[in-house]
């Protein structure tokens, strides 16, 4: 007996887009929510991969820079991107929330919150800026699971002192902190805070590394961080890509500060997980929203994301790192009223 197909021509026509163009039906890996932002990837080498970006600090306007980076990575490079924010109890992005409890009112202190961290399980890479957070255990759990997944980790500026909370993470019976993962924690300002700026000088021996493809003229108005004691250097296994020379004043092209030696501001390393995998890690202590007006720094971060996700053959100096809108971030600092920083819904940062 033969099976006779009786589907009409009209029905077949209705199904053709699903057969010929299945990609248009692919959903973003993170559902829409008023608590975060999602950016579907366009065409590009990152098609089918998902980057989570986290903005969770109080000083450097990551609530503006991470959406800019996400939109650029989605539009010009094809990555699906999601931006998660530290929000207050009303669900507003609130950099003005205190880091430390008021003396005598410790019991009233509310932990910080980053909704959506469970979607790190669907991420192929993480780019984050965070500072001195106290997070609930269930949120720390999602972060630790990602840190121990073997997937790439890119930390910017204050990421190396992300948490006041102790991470529920141990290796060989010893507690792991974020500085162990990133290759050093903030110790002090090597440059003069809010007075010096930083010129990024590429390490000559590494100038041909793929992460530095097309990278030039790195400069930012933030100062250099010291992440290791004087007389020592980066921890074993870290490879410096860029040295930060403190400059007098906050204008690109300013004079070197003769009293300040250059220190590493960008390096990469491996992080060996409990399962024996090695995650690619890049730390840039440059990375304020104002720093990320610099196309050289943006390109370095994009290249690092490609490298970490196994797309090093797709790195090119011709790819676009232009922002997709009118990126004019507010100044860094804690004088929120003068700067114009107030709690806002995530949608304001799209």
Question: Would you name each region that the model predicts?
Answer:
Residues 1-9:
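N-terminal secretory signal peptides that target proteins for export/translocation
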Residues 10-24:
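Bacterial N-terminal signal peptides
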Residues 28-46, 64-65, 72-76, 86-87, ...:
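Extracellular ligand-binding/catalytic regions of CAZymes and related secreted enzymes
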Residues 37-43, 52-54, 58-155, 159-162:
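Helical hinge/lid and interdomain linker segments adjacent to catalytic or ligand-binding clefts
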Residues 46-47, 121-122, 149, 207, ...:
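Residue-level preference for short coil/turn positions at secondary-structure junctions
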Residues 47, 65-69, 119, 139-143, ...:
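Stable alpha-helical elements in mature extracytoplasmic
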Residues 47-48, 156-254, 317-350:
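An acidic, glycine-rich "communication" segment
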Residues 55, 241-243, 282-286:
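Active-site-proximal beta-strand elements of phosphoester/diester hydrolases
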């Amino acid at each position: 007996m033969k099976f006779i197909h009786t589907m009409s021509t009209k029905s077949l026509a209705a199904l053709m887009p699903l057969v010929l163009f299945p990609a248009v039906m692919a959903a973003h890996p993170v559902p829409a929510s008023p608590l975060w932002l999602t950016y579907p990837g366009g065409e590009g080498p990152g098609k089918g991969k998902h980057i989570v970006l986290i903005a969770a600090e109080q000083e450097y306007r990551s609530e503006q820079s991470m959406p800019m980076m996400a939109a650029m990575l989605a539009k010009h490079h094809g990555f699906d991107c999601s931006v998660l924010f530290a929000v207050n109890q009303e669900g507003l992005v609130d950099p003005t929330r205190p880091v430390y409890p008021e003396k005598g009112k410790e019991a009233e202190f509310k932990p910080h919150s980053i909704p959506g961290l469970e979607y790190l399980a669907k991420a192929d890479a993480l780019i984050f800026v965070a500072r001195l957070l106290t997070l609930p255990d269930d949120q720390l759990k999602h972060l630790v699971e990602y840190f121990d997944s073997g997937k790439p980790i890119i930390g910017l500026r204050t990421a190396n002192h992300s948490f006041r909370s102790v991470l529920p993470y141990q290796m060989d019976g010893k507690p792991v902190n974020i500085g162990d993962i990133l290759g050093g924690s903030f110790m002090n300002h090597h440059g003069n805070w809010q007075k010096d700026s930083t010129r990024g000088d590429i390490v000559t021996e590494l100038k041909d590394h793929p992460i530095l493809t097309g990278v030039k003229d790195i400069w930012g108005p933030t100062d250099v961080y010291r992440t290791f004691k004087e007389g020592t250097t980066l921890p074993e296994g870290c490879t410096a890509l860029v040295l930060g020379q403190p400059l007098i004043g906050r204008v690109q092209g300013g004079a070197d500060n003769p009293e300040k030696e250059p220190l590493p501001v960008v390096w990469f390393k491996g992080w060996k997980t409990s399962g024996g995998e090695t995650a690619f890690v890049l730390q840039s202590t440059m990375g304020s929203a104002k720093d990320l007006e610099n196309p050289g720094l943006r390109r370095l971060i994009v290249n690092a994301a490609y490298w970490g996700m196994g797309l090093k053959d797709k790195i090119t100096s011709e790819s676009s790192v232009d922002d997709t809108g009118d990126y004019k971030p507010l100044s860094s600092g804690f004088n929120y009223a003068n700067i114009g920083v107030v709690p806002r819904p995530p949608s304001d940062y799209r």
